[in-house]
Amino acid sequence: FKVLEGEMKKGFYYIIALLIVSLFWSCSTKKNTKASRFYHAFNSRYNIYFNGKTSFDEALLSMQNGYKESYSDMILMYPISAQPKDKPETGGPFDRAIEKSNKAIKLHSIKAKPPKKPGWRNDPKQRAWQEQEEYNPFLKKCWLMMGQAQFYNADFLQASATFSYIARHYAHDEEVVAEARLWQARCYSEMEWFYEAEDILGKLNTNGIPRKNLNQYAAVYADYLVKNKQYEEAVPYFKTAIKAEKNRRQRTRMKYLLGQIYAEQDQNGLAY
């Protein structure tokens, strides 16, 4: 009986090991199934991304708290604009968020094509599905966090390259493309590459901005116009951006700057 019991235990462990291997294989990034997409989206979101986003938020709050405002001139719309344009080396307080983004992409990216359905070439949705470059539905968040972390590290050139890649990588998702292009325009504005920033903003406006991105567009364009001292043109975009801004501190900053713009235009009745 002891021999039989030992054999049964071995068989049980073998079955468990087989199930674990089967589960791992079914959720491998080399397989593109509903199960593998769910598994890798879940793990990238609630494990790696969560830790990176927590670090990102803490670094951003610390940056905001540490910024000393100067009221002798027109204030900056965003404190990041006070950073030097010619930073000698990359890196900074947002490195951990970048590290976590890279880790999530490395471990959980699914680039394998899904099984093709009969007649897929004649179905626009199925054709677009097959043409995607990334099938983990959550990784777009990781890519965007990476670019934003580089941006807040004041590595604007590096961040602009990341956002440019995101726009190409997620060409099938117009909202992600618009968000990435708007961040890219912010990078160009911070580097004072105003022609490049204007080109992106103009093309977005011409091609049509997804409804979800309209408020972001207003904020980015308002900042661009103020940097170019086009104060009158900036006012309507400021009003839209202020209404949409959820962060109380940033909303107060934008209201104060709008008041300064009114004062600059001798509209003191609107300034206060």
Region roles according to the model:
Residues F1-E7, G52, F194:
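Disordered, low-complexity tails and leader-like regions
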Residues C27-Y272:
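Acidic, polar-rich low-complexity tracts and alpha-helical solenoid repeat scaffolds
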Residues E5-I15:
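Bacterial N-terminal signal peptides that target proteins for export
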